[in-house]
């Protein structure tokens, strides 16, 4: 019967499960909020530079 047959599915057939199991985190781990705050700070500095920097 079909219900007794165990299928591996598309992911294991394509090797995707093995790929995601071997994934390593490289580089510094940053909090997502910190990345947003840094982006906002850089945007503010750019806008202030446009205002105060002599053309």
Swiss-Prot record:
The chain crosses the membrane at residues 32-51. The keyword Protein transport applies. Its main location: membrane. The keyword Transmembrane applies. It is a single-pass membrane protein. One of its GO terms (biological process) is protein transport. Residues 52-55 are extracellular. One of its GO terms (cellular component) is plasma membrane. Keywords: Cell membrane, Membrane, Protein transport, Translocation, Transmembrane, Transmembrane helix, Transport. Residues 1-31 are cytoplasmic. It comes from the Archaea. It is found in: Cell membrane. InterPro entries: Preprot_translocase_SecG, SecG/Sec61-beta/Sbh. Component of the protein translocase complex. Heterotrimer consisting of alpha (SecY), beta (SecG) and gamma (SecE) subunits. Can form oligomers of the heterotrimer. Belongs to the SEC61-beta family. HAMAP family: SecG. Involved in protein export. The function of the beta subunit is unknown, but it may be involved in stabilization of the trimeric complex. This is Preprotein translocase subunit SecG. It comes from Thermoplasma volcanium (strain ATCC 51530 / DSM 4299 / JCM 9571 / NBRC 15438 / GSS1). The gene is secG.
């Amino acid at each position: 019967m079909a219900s007794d047959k165990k299928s591996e599915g598309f992911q294991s057939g394509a090797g995707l499960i093995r790929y995601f199991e071997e994934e390593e985190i490289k580089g510094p781990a940053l909090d997502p909020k910190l990345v947003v705050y840094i982006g906002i700070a850089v945007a503010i500095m750019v806008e202030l530079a446009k205002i105060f920097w002599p053309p």
